Amino acid sequence: TLYIVYNLLNNIFSQTCVIIGHIAIIGGEKMELTEIKEKTLQALNELLEQANLKKDDIFVLGMSTSEIQGQHIGKHSNIDIGRTVVNTINDRLKEIGVHLAVQGCEHLNRALVVEESVAEKNNLEIVTVYPSLHAGGAGQIAAFEAFDNPVEVEHITAKAGMDIGDTSIGMHVKFVQIPVRTSVTEIGKAHVTFLRSRPKLIGGQRAKYTWDPFN
């Protein structure tokens, strides 16, 4: 009986993320929140170098704090990790005038948190729902805390985005989507992917894709 109880407690501990100061104890391993912040910022900066974003463009973030901890997506949301990632990205994007949209989980139909002014300017469909740890996730809660007037919208057409933990952001990035490679492949224990976009190339045999109208 004692052996069973020991194994049960050990399993519970191994699935737990405890925040002590700036250190996350994840499954018995230490992970500095500053390390998560640094990796996130490095990844974002490398993406921005290739994404050619302009002022007032929208950038989508999909993230799983569970996956960052090495756990199954949606099972172990952690608000401290969520705040670290969202605040890092939001602060950087503000510097260049780009708007952040934070995607929620499937339980909210992958709705997104944006500033109300962004929703109104882009004629986005606002929906009535509030995120929680188990429906929307830690990233959306962090966005609600960070934004001035946060709202949830059903759909956006972002120019670029970052996906931390294989949350699938493609439905919210404009055509044509282009995968971007950076030196950062993981944040914590989560797989990271990136998308930018370009206008479609249209036309047939006579179409040109550079300005040369008389030839």
Model region roles, listed by residue range:
Residues 31-59, 79-92:
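N-terminal glycine-/serine-/threonine-rich phosphate-binding loop
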Residues 51-53, 135, 181-186:
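Solvent-exposed alpha-helices and their adjacent loops that cap or buttress functional pockets
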Residues 1-30:
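Short, Lys/Arg-enriched N-terminal segments with co-localized hydrophobic residues
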Residues 73-79:
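Short glycine-enriched, charge-decorated loop/helix-capping segments at active-site entrances
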Residues 45, 49-52, 90-98, 144-152, ...:
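Generic secondary-structure signature for well-ordered alpha-helical cores
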Residues 141, 145-215:
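Glycine-rich, aromatic-bearing surface loops/beta-hairpins
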